[in-house]
Amino acid sequence: MFITGAFFDILEVGPKKIRRCFELVRVRFAPSPTGHLHVGGARTALFNWMFARKEGGKFILRIEDTDTERSSREYEQQILESLRWCGLDWDEGPDIGGDFGPYRQSERLEIYREYAEKLVEDKRAYYVVYDKEDPSKELFTTYEYPHEYKEKGHPVTIKFKVLPGKTSFEDLLKGYMEFDNSTLEDFIIMKSNGFPTYNFAVVVDDHLMRISHVFRGEDHLSNTPKQLMIYEAFGWEAPVFMHIPLILGSDRTPLSKRHGATSVEHFRREGILSRALMNYLALLGWRVEGDEIFTIEEKLQSFDPKDISNKGVIFDYQKLEWVNGKHMRRIDLEDLKREFIEWAKYAGKEIPSVDERYFSETLRICREKVNTLSQLYDIMYPFMNDDYEYEKDYVEKFLKREEAERVLEEAKKAFKDLNSWNMEEIEKTLRDLSEKGLASKKVVFQLIRGAVTGKLVTPGLFETIEVLGKERTLKRLERTLQFLKKT
């Protein structure tokens, strides 16, 4: 809750109760730009974003690019673009700045060096000098900067001194956690190349950026005791930690490429709506009351991080598609049209120029049969293109039948004589045709369906023909008859 603009919480840490006050909820998402945005990272960003927005706080984006070999600005831009597509905006970050920047770790090296040297001054860290020929071999340690050895080319790092005792904290999901310091050795906080290690950089950054809560994957749980030791060495108050169970594959191991696609970029390209992806990711671990199909904005005020499950959840690709299909049929037709056009441009798909009303009507009937924008494009293709191809199954199972030509000729004649072009009259015409004994109803309907679309699976046949219109339907029947005569 907020009292005079401050966020308070009370934690029980073992036998002690600690009351902490934060001027403002400040959370961060800090990806490493070494690849595309993983759906697990997107879910972590979502939970942080929802907490900040509900509590009137700030959501900070920080780029952790200290892995100089794997990090790239290209991946950074892709991550930012994926976050924007997900509908997640930030209040401070590398692209918009803020009061606590820079927001790229590679631009904060001098800050880390100064704080590491402060720990050396306080005897909580020390320099380590290594052999020039064998950089893995430690020569000696010292509290004085080894200028002479550094100038001679010896690698020099700074190590943090682990003190005896225990380190504990209260995790919002996992409860009281305690670690025996004897299980940890002194660890490097500044590498020989002048870059900080992960555990040191995040502590300095989170403190200086006034981060109040750290919500992250439980794969970071083992890092927490080291980070808490650094907080203690500086005399800083640690943020509230919450370690979220990982998203799992079907074999209950952490979701990875061996299970299938894992990047936000992939699902975007495949035609998943951003609102559907966020809906599904929210369902992965968050206990939501009511309808499971929703937009994040609809559920924002009911979000409580304590409602997140402490168990791992399996990523179900089919469930994601199902959720997406529900959203495609739920949203306003004009919104779907806009999203479809934007997706086609992103995926490199060409949409032919057609009448606006015809396009909308096609979209209306086709969205009922599919679950992704990619599938929507495929099913709409013959509506948008007169040079569609005939599916092999249509040709082999129906068009090569002896009665095919006569059925199509009769259909062409019946539609030509039809004065009122509406679904009721079209249905009556086709049912009358199927009762003439030319072929079974299924064969008649599938012959005509394939003739006007090239496909055996389409929206309802009567709707399809109504939307195609009389002129287009007659032309397509004639086109198929000409194709039949050539085969």
Swiss-Prot record:
Please state which protein family the record places this protein in.
Belongs to the class-I aminoacyl-tRNA synthetase family. Glutamate--tRNA ligase type 1 subfamily.
Pfam families in the record, alphabetically?
Answer: Anticodon_2, tRNA-synt_1c
**Which GO terms label this protein's molecular function in UniProt?**
ATP binding; glutamate-tRNA ligase activity; tRNA binding; zinc ion binding
Q: Which organism is it from?
A: Thermotoga maritima (strain ATCC 43589 / DSM 3109 / JCM 10099 / NBRC 100826 / MSB8)
List the Gene3D superfamilies hit by this protein, alphabetically: 1.10.10.350, Glutamate-tRNA synthetase, class I, anticodon-binding domain 1 (1.10.8.70), Glutamyl-trna Synthetase, Domain 2 (1.10.1160.10), Glutamyl-tRNA Synthetase, Domain 3 (3.90.800.10), HUPs (3.40.50.620)
Which top EC class is named for this enzyme in its record?
ligase
Write down the EC number.
Answer: 6.1.1.17
Please tell me which stretches of this chain the record labels as motif 'KMSKS' region.
254-258
Q: What is this protein called?
A: Glutamate--tRNA ligase 2
Find motif ('HIGH' region) and give its ranges: 31-41
List, alphabetically, the GO terms of the cellular component aspect: cytosol
The entry describes its oligomerization and partners as: Monomer.
Q: Which reaction does it catalyse?
A: tRNA(Glu) + L-glutamate + ATP = L-glutamyl-tRNA(Glu) + AMP + diphosphate
